[in-house]
């Protein structure tokens, strides 16, 4: 083992935060220094040259001050016996750089701790604070890291002696293995194996437990029900299916695959052909798939990997739909207990305690969103939608006074994608078909996730809890998805016959499911499974939940094609078996010469005992709202701080919202980029205005008063959120229903039944809406010992509805941004509560620690349908200036958020809403506020009346320029405050969370910027006509020069880049680095090269640096790139990850010696912003005739800060006029202030060019906003092409 010191690992503010945590834990630590240390396992000694190459390879990241380590060492490494994603990618890079004798690279974090002597207990406490026991180990000596490379002999299979010991043997195994088997399941297994005349193996029992867990089998939703002694006619699942039976319109696949599919649009899908690799549009049906999952249990144990693998698993579900599909846009949501932010505790937040084995709500909301965002970011899927609710209170509900809240959190992960018409249905698995595992190797992680998530937190052993959490490698999943993409793009020649993702239960669930669904059995070889931990037992190899894996059936004749695709994409795979005629599972183990599994499929997946739920209804006992202590002014401030209402920027800007170039409505609205969008919208392709939309609805606290009302409101809110897009008929909308319940808790089972019936049998059929997909999580309770007291925290019944719809025209989507530039205007409230104004279970009651008695509800189904249809007319006729639904916080919050988005004031009169101002302003009945032109008000009111809404419409007042927020009732002032003051209150929760998580200086700067009342918002100044197509004369000649669209494993922005060059008249060619390294392609035939954005090698060894070094340290490929850059007629562009990569190739690029490096953002966070830039005067041939132009652009990166050697280097860069783009603030001034400058680069620098102008590198993404509709905000006069299209046309013009 070789040990190589690395660079300092933590920035100054991270060290400060670590010292603060030590102080909070009463650990007397005076200083901490942390640096990376690398360990190389080599098969032969490295030569001096190879050693130098390895040293250079391991120099990466920002240049932080180094000092010799002093004090005691605590070395944090990956857990011995595991291989980290960092290790596999770093080893790949080393091999691609010619260091073939490196068997494996691994990285540790060496902490040098200074301070008074700590006792042994304190050292243990400090070690616990510095590492994640799930994934890491702590050593006190560098040599101890040798254990990382130790190899163990495989452990044998174990048998459970039921023939000798009978039932007791199974009962003991149930406890020891954490199987969560019910008594009747134990009886079933006893009968089955006794009938087979043999003892089961541990692997067979484990496989059965996972496949038949509540998590996988949904026993409660398929159970028979008796309520109050009355047999119920339907199961829960049958009531959900009733919606499809009533309205099957537009549904192509429901209830039988990894995701549901509905009809989409005929559009040009843009991808490279297999024959020549040239990108083009392919006119075909792009049907819409939809899926929403939860990952609650793992997120409670370890939030980052829990949320990351939640998103990763849901993405795999989408990709594994039909015979292979394309995930497109994602959503993430969280329900947690109270945050209790240190120094920002709120009056309604009481500490009720929690179990030690789960983390705090604050920890979940600090780490969980980062994990979910990081996976989506690295995979390359925009996260466009979400929700965030906190609830934790002692309330008087159905079961009397008890604790209700989300100690077991909800972590929601979902999204939509597209699929070809001929791939919607899975194919036939032929006898002899090869059974393949695509993706990463097996590791000893995530064991028992299905069974563990089916238990209430606190029932299982703490070690089993930790064992059941997986960890993530999104870059591997991206590689697998590229393989799936290449397969479905082959159309009828798609080699994939059948595909499933590997999730709960690992291969033990996925492979039996695959062959069973295909009507076959399977014969497998255990030792053919890719395995990074050879010491695992057969149970661990077969049942672990290592992520980023899919199982496929491939016809033998197509294996060569499949192998070729996988090799090009560097996606690992293994053929582990064959499909058999007999429906039998046989798993052979050639190492031990035995068969750990040998059982009929029907024992595993057959008719296990059906559950019966015999339950009792309980009546809600909510108390009437006590108003004595409620002041309206104080209520407003409290509600603005409540997370469900408060600004959620800290959850949004960490997530890429522009990748694909097909996002037309993200969370951020208008020139001031306020996060108040009601729904997410994507275009169906890069050549059309058809699209897809999705929205969320959930009102869980209402279930504490009325289960059915809560469910109805969730559906209603999803509809009011999506209503301001152009959908057409209501039945176009399809819903996902995610049900979370504490099954078995008094009253909850009957409440669940009532809620499902309300939606599945009544509301949705009446609206003609289908629920073709959903999921349930039935163990939403936490138990623990608090001193001498046994405590329970039970979540409210929680239904999260996600609405999906096909969109007729994405340009018609209306946002909450109030307009004061359209002449006189009118604000209308459409009150679907019809004056009920119920205050039970609202934000108001929550912030005053009450529940109330009567909640909101869907008051009139016909009016809800009429409302939707009326909005569709108004959207299609373009009569709406602004639209925002009423939800958490009520009418006052709706109006405030609209004013924030418009940076304006409102003056309204609520006299028509009754005499109870508190109820009028804070009820959360369904409804919306619309803004229309004053002269159209009468016509709009008539249209609403024609749709049955006459008694729901109230004229409120108008939006006005300025800072006023005035609410009156007749002549009485009800509430008056500055809009800017409300805006800051609304922002404070996000600010405090951001200060805790990121660089607090940046968080403070952002909060300070929100106080600038003179901020004009995003604005545009162009020095050219964006409607002029300067490439047109060259396109007319029909000569299409070739551009090499270069990608490395992990790159995710190549398709939209190709589309931009294609539109400018190029033939865009898909070139993978594996093509160049293998010699399949070279750069000689290209005049233009573009290196695309993403996460090459998952940013291991520095963003873009591993990619660059695989070029620099490969002599033939290095010469090829150098020759390209030295040809006087070539053009080269590097964007984001491609920019980072090319900046590290500067020694090969003439005139690039002054280029900087691009390193970790000053905020120490991934930054996704829509930022204003100005084109600087430079030689860049891409920016010709654009100098002086100011316009917004997509920014999405974690490492974009310009790093120069010193002041002289910066001066040389400036004096050479090589800066091509700079960040400016909304006043047009070059800035280093956050967030206008999202990465902290000196002088606002964000793009540089070579002396000749032929090579340009830039961190922002022009390719994601080359279409006007894909800009988060844009001036209304822009046409189809945004001004950024000029960059690509300049390139085409340059080539003549």
UniProtKB/Swiss-Prot annotation:
Q: Which residues form a coiled coil?
A: none
Sites binding Mg(2+) sit at 678, 717, 721, 885
Q: In which pathway does it act?
A: Purine metabolism; IMP biosynthesis via de novo pathway; 5-amino-1-(5-phospho-D-ribosyl)imidazole from N(2)-formyl-N(1)-(5-phospho-D-ribosyl)glycinamide: step 1/2
* Keyword terms of this UniProt record: ATP-binding, Cytoplasm, Glutamine amidotransferase, Ligase, Magnesium, Metal-binding, Nucleotide-binding, Purine biosynthesis
Q: Which InterPro entries match?
A: Class_I_gatase-like (IPR029062), FGAR-AT_N (IPR040707), FGAR-AT_PurM_N-like (IPR055181), PurL_large (IPR010073), PurL_linker (IPR041609), PurM-like_C_dom (IPR010918), PurM-like_C_sf (IPR036676), PurM-like_N_sf (IPR036921)
Entry annotation: catalytic residues: 1136 (nucleophile), 1261, 1263
List compositional bias (Basic and acidic residues) regions by residue number. Answer: 1000-1013
> What does the protein in this record do?
Phosphoribosylformylglycinamidine synthase involved in the purines biosynthetic pathway. Catalyzes the ATP-dependent conversion of formylglycinamide ribonucleotide (FGAR) and glutamine to yield formylglycinamidine ribonucleotide (FGAM) and glutamate.
Description of how the protein assembles with itself and partners? Monomer.
HAMAP family recorded: PurL_1 (MF_00419)
Q: What is this protein called?
A: Phosphoribosylformylglycinamidine synthase
Q: Give the gene that encodes this protein.
A: purL
């Amino acid at each position: 083992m070789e040990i190589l010191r690395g660079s300092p690992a933590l920035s100054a503010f991270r060290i400060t935060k670590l010292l603060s945590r030590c102080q909070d834990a009463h650990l007397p630590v005076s200083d901490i220094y942390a640096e990376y240390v690398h360990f190389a396992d080599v098969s032969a000694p490295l030569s001096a040259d190879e050693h130098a190459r390895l040293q250079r390879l391991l120099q990466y990241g920002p240049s932080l001050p180094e000092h010799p380590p002093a004090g005691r060492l605590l070395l944090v490494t990956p857990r011995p016996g595991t291989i980290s994603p960092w290790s596999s990618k770093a080893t790949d890079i080393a091999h691609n750089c010619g260091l073939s004798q490196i068997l494996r690279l691994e990285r540790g974090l060496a902490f040098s701790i200074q301070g008074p002597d700590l006792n042994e207990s304190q050292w243990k406490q400090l070690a616990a604070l510095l590492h994640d026991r799930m994934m890491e180990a702590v050593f006190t000596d560098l040599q101890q890291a040798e254990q990382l490379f130790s190899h163990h002999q495989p452990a044998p299979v174990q048998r459970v002696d039921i023939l000798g010991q009978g039932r007791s043997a199974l009962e003991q195994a149930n406890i020891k293995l954490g199987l969560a088997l019910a008594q009747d399941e134990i009886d079933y297994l006893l009968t089955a194996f006794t009938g087979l005349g043999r003892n089961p193996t541990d692997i067979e029992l484990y496989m059965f437990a996972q496949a038949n867990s509540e998590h996988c089998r949904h026993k409660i939703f398929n159970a028979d029900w008796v309520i109050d002694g009355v047999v119920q006619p339907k199961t829960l699942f049958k009531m959900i299916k009733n919606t499809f039976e009533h309205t099957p319109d537009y549904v192509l696949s429901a209830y039988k695959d990894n995701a549901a599919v509905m009809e989409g649009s005929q559009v040009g899908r843009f991808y490279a052909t297999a024959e020549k690799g040239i990108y083009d549009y392919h006119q075909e049906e792009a049907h819409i798939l939809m899926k929403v999952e939860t990952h609650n249990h793992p997120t409670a144990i370890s939030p980052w990997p829990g949320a990351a693998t939640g998103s990763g698993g849901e993405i795999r579900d989408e990709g594994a739909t039909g015979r292979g599909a394309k995930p497109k846009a994602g959503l993430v949501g969280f329900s947690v207990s109270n945050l209790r932010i240190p120094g920002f505790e709120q009056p309604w937040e009481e500490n009720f305690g929690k179990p030690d084995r789960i983390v705090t709500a604050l920890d979940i909301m600090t780490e969980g969103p980062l994990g979910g965002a990081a996976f989506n970011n690295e995979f390359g899927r925009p996260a466009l939608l979400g929700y965030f609710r906190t609830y934790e209170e002692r309330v008087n509900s159905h079961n009397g006074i008890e604790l209700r809240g989300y100690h077991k959190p909800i972590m929601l992960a979902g999204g939509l994608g597209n699929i070809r018409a001929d791939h919607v249905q899975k194919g036939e698995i032929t006898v002899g078909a090869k059974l393949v595992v695509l993706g990463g190797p097996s590791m000893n992680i995530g064991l028992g996730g299905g069974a563990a998530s089916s238990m209430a937190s606190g029932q299982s052993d703490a070690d089993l809890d930790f064992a059941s959490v997986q960890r993530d490698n999104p870059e591997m999943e991206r590689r697998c998805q590229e393989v799936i993409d290449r397969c479905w793009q082959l159309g009828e020649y798609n080699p994939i016959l059948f595909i499933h993702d590997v999730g709960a239960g690992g291969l033990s669930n996925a492979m039996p499911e695959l062959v069973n669904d295909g009507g076959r059995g399977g014969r497998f070889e255990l030792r053919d499974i890719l395995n990074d931990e050879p010491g695992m037992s057969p149970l661990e190899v077969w049942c672990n939940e290592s992520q980023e894996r899919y199982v496929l059936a491939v016809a033998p004749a197509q294996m060569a094609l499949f192998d070729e695709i996988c090799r090009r994409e560097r996606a690992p795979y293994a053929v582990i078996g064959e499909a058999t005629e007999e429906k039998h599972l046989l798993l052979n183990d050639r190492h031990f010469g035995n068969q750990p599994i040998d059982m009929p499929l029907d024992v595993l997946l057959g008719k296990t005992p059906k559950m019966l739920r015999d339950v009792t209804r309980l009546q809600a006992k909510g108390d009437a709202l006590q108003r004595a202590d409620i002041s309206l002014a104080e209520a407003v401030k409290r509600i603005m701080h409540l997370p469900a209402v408060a600004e959620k920027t800290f959850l949004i800007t960490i997530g890429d919202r522009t990748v694909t170039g097909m996002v037309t409505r993200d969370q951020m609205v208008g020139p001031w980029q306020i996060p108040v969008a009601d729904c997410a919208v994507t275009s169906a392709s890069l050549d059309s205005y058809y699209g897809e939309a999705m929205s969320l609805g959930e009102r869980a606290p209402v279930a504490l008063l009325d289960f059915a009302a809560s469910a109805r409101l969730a559906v209603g809110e999803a509809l009011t959120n999506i209503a301001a897009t152009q959908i057409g008929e209501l039945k176009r909308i399809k819903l996902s229903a995610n049900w979370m319940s504490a099954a078995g808790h008094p009253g909850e089972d009957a409440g669940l039944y009532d809620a499902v019936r309300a939606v599945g049998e009544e509301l949705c059929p009446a609206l003609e809406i289908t629920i073709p997909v959903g999921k349930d999580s039935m163990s939403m309770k936490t138990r623990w010992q608090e001193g001498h007291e046994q405590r329970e925290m039970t979540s409210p019944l929680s239904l999260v509805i996600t609405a999906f719809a096909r969109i007729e025209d994405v340009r018609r989507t209306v946002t909450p941004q109030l307009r004061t530039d359209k002449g006189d205007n009118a604000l209308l409230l459409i009150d679907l509560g019809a004056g009920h104004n119920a205050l039970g279970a609202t934000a108001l009651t929550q912030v005053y620690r009450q529940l109330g008695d009567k909640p909101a509800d869907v008051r009139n189904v016909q009016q809800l349908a009429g409302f939707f249809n009326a909005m569709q007319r108004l959207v299609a006729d373009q009569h709406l200036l602004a639209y925002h639904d009423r939800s958490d916080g009520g009418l006052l919050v709706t109006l405030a958020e609209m004013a924030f988005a418009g940076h304006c004031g409102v003056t309204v009169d609520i006299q028509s809403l009754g005499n109870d101002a508190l109820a009028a302003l804070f009820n959360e009945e369904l409804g919306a506020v619309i803004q229309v032109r004053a002269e159209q008000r009468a016509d709009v009111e008539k249209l609403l009346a024609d749709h049955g809404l006459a008694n729901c419409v109230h004229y409120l007042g108008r939006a006005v320029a300025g800072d006023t927020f005035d609410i009156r009732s007749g002549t009485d002032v009800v509430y008056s405050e500055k809009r800017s003051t409300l805006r800051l209150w609304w922002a404070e929760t996000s600010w405090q969370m951001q200060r805790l998580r990121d660089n607090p200086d940046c968080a403070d700067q952002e909060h300070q910027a929100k106080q600038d009342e003179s901020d004009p918002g995003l604005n545009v100044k162009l020095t050219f006509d964006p409607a002029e197509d300067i490439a047109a004369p060259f396109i007319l000649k029909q000569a299409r020069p070739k551009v090499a669209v270069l990608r490395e494993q992990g790159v995710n922005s190549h398709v939209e880049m190709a589309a931009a060059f294609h539109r400018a008249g190029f033939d865009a060619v898909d070139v993978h680095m594996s093509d160049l390294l293998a010699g399949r392609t070279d750069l000689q035939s290209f005049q233009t090269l573009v290196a695309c954005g993403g996460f090459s090698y998952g940013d291991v060894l520095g963003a873009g640096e591993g990619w660059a070094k695989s070029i620099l340290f490969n002599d033939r490929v290095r010469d090829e790139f150098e020759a390209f850059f030295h040809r006087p007629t070539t053009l080269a562009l590097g964007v984001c990850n491609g920019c980072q990569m090319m900046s590290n190739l500067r020694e090969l690029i003439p005139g690039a010696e002054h280029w900087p490096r691009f390193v970790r953002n000053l905020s120490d966070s991934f930054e996704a912003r829509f930022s204003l830039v100005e084109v600087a005067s430079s030689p860049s041939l891409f920016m010709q005739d654009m100098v002086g132009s100011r316009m917004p652009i997509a920014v999405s990166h974690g490492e974009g800060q310009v790093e120069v050697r010193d002041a002289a280097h910066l001066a040389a860069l400036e004096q050479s006029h090589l800066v091509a783009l700079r960040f400016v603030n909304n006043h047009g001034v070059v800035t280093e202030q956050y967030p206008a400058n999202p990465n902290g680069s000196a002088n606002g620098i964000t793009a540089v060019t070579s002396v000749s102008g032929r090579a340009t590198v830039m961190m922002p993404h022009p390719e994601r906003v080359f279409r006007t509709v894909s800009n988060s905000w844009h001036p209304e006069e822009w046409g189809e092409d945004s001004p950024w299209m000029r960059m690509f046309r300049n390139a085409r013009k340059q080539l003549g």
